Amino acid sequence: MNSAEKKLYISDVTLRDGSHAIRHQYSVDHVRAIAAALDDAGVDSIEVAHGDGLQGSSFNYGFGAHTDVEWIAAAAQSVKKAKIATLLIPGIGTTHDLRHAFDAGARVVRVATHCTEADVSRQHLDFARELGMDAVGFLMMSHMTTPQKLAEQAKMMETFGATCVYVVDSGGALGMNEVRDRFRALKAVLKSDTQTGMHAHHNLSLGVANSLVAVEEGCDRIDASLAGMGAGAGNAPLEVFIAAAQRQGWNHGCDLYRLMDAADDLVRPLQDRPVRVDRETLALGFAGVYSSFLRHAEVAAGKYGLKTVDILVELGRRKMVGGQEDMIVDVALDLLKRQQPIMSDAH
C-alpha cells in the first residue's frame, strides 16, 4: 500500500487499554491532560473507558476510579479535533450504557467479541448506527482461530453494520506472517469500502512490526498507545509506530515529538508496574493468554505463593479467553493442590 497517498487513521487507546496497566485508576485530571496532548499531536480518535469497556468496573475486572461517563466527558471537553471513542463488550456493556457514552461525547464505538463470537455484536452495532456513531467491529484473541474463520466473523460484523473490522491480537501472540494472512483473508471477503484495523500487543515485542505489516496489507486504522500503555507488555507504542511510519514516508498526520513528550512526561510516570516485555508478559505472548489477565494473575500468585508465569501458562493451556478472569483463582488453587497433594486430600 502507498501510505504516502492514503492517510492512516491513528486510534489511540492509552485511556482505555492503558487503564489495565494501572488497574483502572486514571483520575479525571489524567484523562484531561492526556486527551488534550493526544489531540494536539493530531491523532484521529482517543478511546476512553474502563479497560474492559463500558461497565467493566466490577468485582470481576476491577473497580475504576471513576465511571466511564465521567472519563468520557472529561476527554470530550478536552479535545478540539479528535473523536472520542469507547469500547463495548456485549455481556458487560449494554445499549443503555452506549447511549450514556454517546451523550457524554463518544462518537466511535468498538464492539468487541471473542474472535469466534461475532454473532453477539449485532444488537450493539445496530444501535450504534442508529445513534449515528462510527460502528467498529473488534475481534479479540484473533490468534485463536484461522484466517479464513476470522474473515467469516468479520463479514458477519460487516453485515451487522460495522464500517471497519479489527484484527485484535489480545494475547500479543501473532507473528508477522500470521498478521499478513489474516488481513489477506479479511480483504478477500469484505466490501472494498469496509475498513480494517490492527490492534497489537507487544508481548513478543512485535507490536510495531505487526502494525507495519498490517498497513502493508492495506490496513486502514492502527491502534497504539503512548509509551505502549496497555495490558500485558502494552500495545504498540504510539510514538514508536509513528516514528517508523514516518521513516517509511507514510501519511499519519501526527506530530512525533509531541507524542514523545506526552509518553514520557504524562504517561510513563503513572505506571506502578513497568509496561514492558519481561518474564510475565513474555509468558502471555508465548502462551497466547489474554493480556489483561496479567495483573489479576500477579495478585493470585502473591496470595497463594505461586509463580505468575505458572498461572499464565496454565491459563493458556486451558485456552481461557477474555471475560474469564474469575478462572484465574481457580487455576491458582488447582496449581496449589498439585504442589501440596497432602493438603488436597484433607478437603
From Swiss-Prot:
GO molecular function, one term: 4-hydroxy-2-oxovalerate aldolase activity
Catalytic reactions on record: (S)-4-hydroxy-2-oxopentanoate = acetaldehyde + pyruvate
Database matches in Gene3D superfamilies: 1.10.8.60, Aldolase class I
EC number: 4.1.3.39
Residues under site feature: Transition state stabilizer: 16
Any Pfam family: HMGL-like
InterPro entries per record: 2-IPM_HCS-like, 4OH_2_O-val_aldolase, Aldolase_TIM, DmpG_comm, DRE_TIM_HOA, PYR_CT
Keywords assigned by UniProt, alphabetized: Aromatic hydrocarbons catabolism, Lyase, Manganese, Metal-binding
Domain of life where this protein originates: Bacteria
Active site, per annotation: 20 (proton acceptor)
Domain Pyruvate carboxyltransferase: 8-260
Binding site for substrate: 16-17, 170, 199, 290
Biological processes annotated in GO: catabolic process; L-leucine biosynthetic process
UniProt similarity note: Belongs to the 4-hydroxy-2-oxovalerate aldolase family.
Name of the protein in question: 4-hydroxy-2-oxovalerate aldolase 2
Organism per entry: Burkholderia cenocepacia (strain ATCC BAA-245 / DSM 16553 / LMG 16656 / NCTC 13227 / J2315 / CF5610)
